[in-house]
């Protein structure tokens, strides 16, 4: 396994501390007036989704986790577990809703996602940063609604609710940023 020092840390890097895999979500290099520089990071656990703050000083080391990402197809939710299939080997993997976390609200049947394995066990799902989803329910438009930058709530086919501009209608397919949970634009379909 690779080892990282303080200078190697950056946003998006995956590290392992005490046997738990984390992803660095925020990174700040601090150089105080007196004393040695250090790095303050916020790390998110792949196992339980909790975000922790950690400080690394010069000489501190952390390990690279034994993580493997594999592209798989989301099949269905049986109520307790979500079922995924490797499209090459047809091997199926079941992951609990708890392990999937926030990614679940963006998933629809047939979608290709990245499954994260730690030491051979499926521990999480990463959906694409931008997904195209159909609007299944939203308020109708009234004359004058298209003026200004007002928004209305819309329920998507995955069950997620996002704010959309008034000119977008029910039945249309839109592009959504899954990280921020925001409407981007209408999809070109």
UniProtKB/Swiss-Prot annotation:
UniProt keyword list: Cytoplasm, Elongation factor, Protein biosynthesis
InterPro entries: Elong-fact-P_C, NA-bd_OB-fold, Rib_uL2_dom2, Transl_elong_fac_P/YeiP, Transl_elong_KOW-like, Transl_elong_P/YeiP_cen, Transl_elongation_fac_P, Translation_prot_SH3-like_sf
Pfam families: EFP, EFP_N, Elong-fact-P_C
GO biological process: peptide biosynthetic process
Subcellular location(s) of the protein: Cytoplasm
GO cellular component: cytoplasm
GO molecular function: translation elongation factor activity
Database matches in SUPFAM superfamilies: Nucleic acid-binding proteins, Translation proteins SH3-like domain
Pathway(s) it belongs to: Protein biosynthesis; polypeptide chain elongation
Gene3D superfamilies in UniProt: 2.30.30.30, Nucleic acid-binding proteins
PANTHER family, sorted: ELONGATION FACTOR P (PTHR30053), ELONGATION FACTOR P (EF-P) FAMILY PROTEIN (PTHR30053:SF12)
General function of this protein: Involved in peptide bond synthesis. Stimulates efficient translation and peptide-bond synthesis on native or reconstituted 70S ribosomes in vitro. Probably functions indirectly by altering the affinity of the ribosome for aminoacyl-tRNA, thus increasing their reactivity as acceptors for peptidyl transferase.
Similarity-based family: Belongs to the elongation factor P family.
Protein name per Swiss-Prot or TrEMBL: Elongation factor P
Native source species: Campylobacter fetus subsp. fetus (strain 82-40)
Gene from which the chain derives: efp
